[in-house]
Amino acid sequence: MKRAIVIGATSGIGRALAERLAAEGYRVGVTGRREALLEELAASRPGSFCYAAADIMDPAAACAALERLAGELGGMDLCVGSAGTGDLNPGLDYALEEPAIRTNVVGWTAAVDWAYGRFEERGGGHLVVITSVGGLRGGGAAPAYNASKAYQINYAEGLRQRAAKSGLPLPVTDIRPGFVATEMAKGEGLFWVMPVDRVVEGIVRAIRRRRSVAVVTRRWRLPAWLIRHMPECIYRKMG
């Protein structure tokens, strides 16, 4: 039986992906802030899940929880970093920016480094990170969120390069969703908001194919390309 750990599995993409992996025969370790939701997930398919609650904004506690899960699973073949947060911040209030920085940068880095280290010890595996199309450019509505996702995209590329240089058989898959119908989708008039199940289908496809980068769903590929290559003089007027 294959073993996976999903970081940030209490809701949204992380939870739906954990459920899908369990349905496909994985034994899945899940972690997140809200223990009651993790317990509910574990009870939904007895024997398929183990869980450890931890707040990723406390990197030491989060990594200790991941270590417990890996021990209970007897190792891991796949690790998915899905924890993330972000708020619209029209007033540029630092109190709204700090959770995104502590979650998407500080805690995320600790968790991803932990996973990379375990795969390095094991001699391989598969690391998947959920970034965002939002990380392709800065965003005036939520500056810290966009910046943190750009950080994740570049960090994942760095790990991919590191693995290749050392000869470690470790695909690092960067999943870049557009707008998804989860608690994270904030703001009025968002276009092409995708249902979670379709996003998960795209993620599973990318995992199977061991893709380096996957924009999900496919309809977001052209918008992502346009966002990335749009002249700055045009892009700055869009926020």
Positions of predicted regions on the chain:
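Conserved glycine-rich cofactor-binding loop
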Residues: 10-11
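Rossmann-fold cofactor-recognition segment
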Residues: 45-60
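Conserved NAD(P)H cofactor-binding loop of Rossmann-fold oxidoreductase domains
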Residues: 80-88
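Short alpha-helical oligomerization interface
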Residues: 89-102
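Active-site helix of classical SDR
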Residues: 112, 148
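Residue(s) in the substrate-gating loop at a strand-loop-helix junction
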Residues: 132
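C-terminal helical subdomain
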Residues: 174, 186-225
